[in-house]
Amino acid sequence: MARARGSPCPPLPPGRMSWPHGALLFLWLFSPPLGAGGGGVAVTSAAGGGSPPATSCPVACSCSNQASRVICTRRDLAEVPASIPVNTRYLNLQENGIQVIRTDTFKHLRHLEILQLSKNLVRKIEVGAFNGLPSLNTLELFDNRLTTVPTQAFEYLSKLRELWLRNNPIESIPSYAFNRVPSLRRLDLGELKRLEYISEAAFEGLVNLRYLNLGMCNLKDIPNLTALVRLEELELSGNRLDLIRPGSFQGLTSLRKLWLMHAQVATIERNAFDDLKSLEELNLSHNNLMSLPHDLFTPLHRLERVHLNHNPWHCNCDVLWLSWWLKETVPSNTTCCARCHAPAGLKGRYIGELDQSHFTCYAPVIVEPPTDLNVTEGMAAELKCRTGTSMTSVNWLTPNGTLMTHGSYRVRISVLHDGTLNFTNVTVQDTGQYTCMVTNSAGNTTASATLNVSAVDPVAAGGTGSGGGGPGGSGGVGGGSGGYTYFTTVTVETLETQPGEEALQPRGTEKEPPGPTTDGVWGGGRPGDAAGPASSSTTAPAPRSSRPTEKAFTVPITDVTENALKDLDDVMKTTKIIIGCFVAITFMAAVMLVAFYKLRKQHQLHKHHGPTRTVEIINVEDELPAASAVSVAAAAAVASGGGVGGDSHLALPALERDHLNHHHYVAAAFKAHYSSNPSGGGCGGKGPPGLNSIHEPLLFKSGSKENVQETQI
């Protein structure tokens, strides 16, 4: 297209609008200035508000890299600035006076990855304070005044990887305190000096956690860390962990580094580290350790670096295994490791330089050997094997030749930390001889016992079983679950030094005291110490020839049987008393029933006996009124005038009183009297005596013998 004549500018392409020069000048004059920190585009948004985006950096802050980094440190801020650029990725608000983090303070910072609020005066974080931060990766809140873990404030931080809460006056960590942020990989809870309580479920949900700091929290026990299945680094330094127990690190199979410096640890029990299969570095420096259990580090196949310096190690036979382990693991590094503190002759010596020539050691002694056990299939069972010290290691050999150690698990069978072989549910296939092997630096001692498992009798399943809860247990007293036998045979295999072998003993000792012999192990201890192992042996790998001898003797188990028999006698006495009382009550009831029956029989006989009748003559005038008396007299006159029969013409008046109406008895009496009189004849016979006078009427009254004893007519 040709340019028009006199036109100052070339024509615009088709579809483009032409801006007047005045409009462009107006926009240039009134556009807002760029931020002092680098001219990045920013948005203006008040905390918790919804104002439109601003293009400037906050006045109290400095911005760089196109406002993606905002630094507001040491500006005496009491609140979070309102106009933080929307594209900020790094926000530093450390060393200010911020006290409260309010709801939706950062909701417009969707690209924020690192938020530093450390070294403020934050005492409260409102619910929803971190809403709108889907990209937040690191949240630093250390050196503040928080008294509780702001659990609900972490609701929507789906990408949070690091959380720093160290050096806050937090007093307790409740259950599921961090389950809203399962993405956490690093959690710093160090220097919580007012911490008093950690819930058993405090760390539930942190399945991705790799690093945990609980140092300098005044902990007296290691909290439950089972849920941290992916934990790799654990800091426990600066606490007061006097004792490390077995199971303290249960479930931490991925842990690679464990720091326990300055933790006041004095004792580490046998099998305490058995769960740490992946451990590579262990720091136990600056503690109060004097010795370690035999083969403590043996299960730690990946352990490469161990720090044992600055501990008051007591160098004796218990540290020989450690000397051998150090020679194999860190042969050249002697600066990191233990040096003897006692005895005085070995003070300052590196433990890795010690050997058997410096000590006189003996094989371990089994204080509580296993006993033969008779149980029924399906029951739980235990075979105990305890020593007098925790500096030894305990293993078990099963009937099929499998070696069982603490930590090895066969579904139903396990070795507990005290050396006990535990069966949760025995089967008939478990029957056999089990051997306990106790080992220290000088040798090992074994003791065996037989486990007899009987099948369940379907007929007597509900009754007493072999070794069960009844008195008929096989080979047991009282049939308890222990199934103790009355007598058992102990076979002890010992080592006896041959003549002339004393010359091979180390210098500085005239004669080596004897090792564990039959009298020393079994006879010299408590009476119950020899109660029942089927066999026991002691071996010591010393540089001298030895001849094994066997001694067998029978040991009565008196303490167990006497107690069981005493309990059985008490039960029998109680049973006899109950039976006697029942028999006496039954006898008394029978006697009372017989007596009652006899009394009732006599009463029935009395009732069936007919009553004796009597006749009583009473004066009618006393009983009847005048009208009735006249009627009686007239009737008497008619009778005396001659009737056919005296009994048929004697009409007695109806009496008003029922108890005087006895005319039937009167008629019968008259008939009997005149029939027996020969001079009476026909109808003109004489009347009865006393009836000749109408003025003396008589009436016969009958009554029971019970009421009338004697009557005269």
UniProtKB/Swiss-Prot annotation:
The keyword Membrane applies. Residues 497-551, 694-713 are annotated as: Disordered. The keyword Endoplasmic reticulum does not apply. Disulfide bonds join C385-C436. Interacts with PTPRF. Interacts with DLG4. Residues 48-86 form the LRRNT domain. Synaptic adhesion protein. Regulates the formation of excitatory synapses. The trans-synaptic adhesion between LRRC4B and PTPRF regulates the formation of excitatory synapses in a bidirectional manner. Its main location: membrane. This is Leucine-rich repeat-containing protein 4B. It comes from Homo sapiens (Human). InterPro entries: Cys-rich_flank_reg_C, Ig-like_dom, Ig-like_dom_sf, Ig-like_fold, Ig_I-set, Ig_sub, Ig_sub2, Leu-rich_rpt. Glycans are attached at N224, N283, N333, N374, N400, N422, N425, N444, N452. Residues 528-546 have a biased composition (Low complexity). Residues 364-452 form the Ig-like C2-type domain. The lineage of its organism: Eukaryota, Metazoa, Chordata, Craniata, Vertebrata. GO terms for biological process: positive regulation of synapse assembly; regulation of postsynaptic density assembly; regulation of presynapse assembly; synaptic membrane adhesion. SUPFAM superfamilies: Immunoglobulin (SSF48726), L domain-like (SSF52058).
